[in-house]
Amino acid sequence: KNIRRVIQVNQAPIGKTQRSTIVSYLEIFDEIRALFSKTDAAKQMKLGASSFSMNVKGGRCECCQGTGLQKIELNYLPNSYITCPECGGKRFNDQVLSVKYCGKTILDILETPIIDIVNVFKESKKVYQTLSSMIELGLGYLKLGQMSMNLSGGEAQRVKLAKALSSSSYGKNLYILDEPTSGLNDVDIDKFIQVLFSLQKNGETAIIIEHNVEFIKTVADHIIDFGISGGESGGKIVAQGFPEAVFANKVSSLYRLDKLTY
């Protein structure tokens, strides 16, 4: 009754090939391509939504098949990639790149930092909400056309969370997060904390696996401490309860870590 949906967000990669991009993972590319296909220029040239895809024939550069890169196979060495000599890394043919939506080409949308293009999509609720979530989580510097396989574990986790936030109606969702502060600087951690507080205000619950003492102090309502041991020696609850009580408990690993921090 109290939990409507469980959303697990971990640091596993969100893509394994060049075809997997941030925009495709976020599931907003269909809406973006539809917006381009509805422009007068696209209609005059009879360019449908599929013409603005890198993954199918029609509008993409066939030399690189829409990746913007060409693979160079080397004997006894890892494969190398060079910019496509046909399109110069632009992924699409000239006809498609002549079409603009709100002054932007499809390449502009894919290759410009999210924070600089979010307002282009104010009239598209899903796209705008998703990009806004990315910015709130400190990912405004990413580009939609980036290969998702190149994201760090921390970035991948926040992209997953942004997708979940934009696709879930608030209330009675349970988020399970695995070390979300891993690899984040203090500024990004602060942004992430504000997102968690926002979730809490909207009736959401989060279970977080974390080792960052300051982060735990700031966000936790209830702590379950499994101690510092791992393997066969771990997995035992050494303390639990309100944060103040756990940090004051001399048996707790957080008590010792907190003393070391200061």
Predicted stretch roles:
Residues K1-Y262:
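Conserved phosphate-binding elements of NTP-dependent enzyme cores
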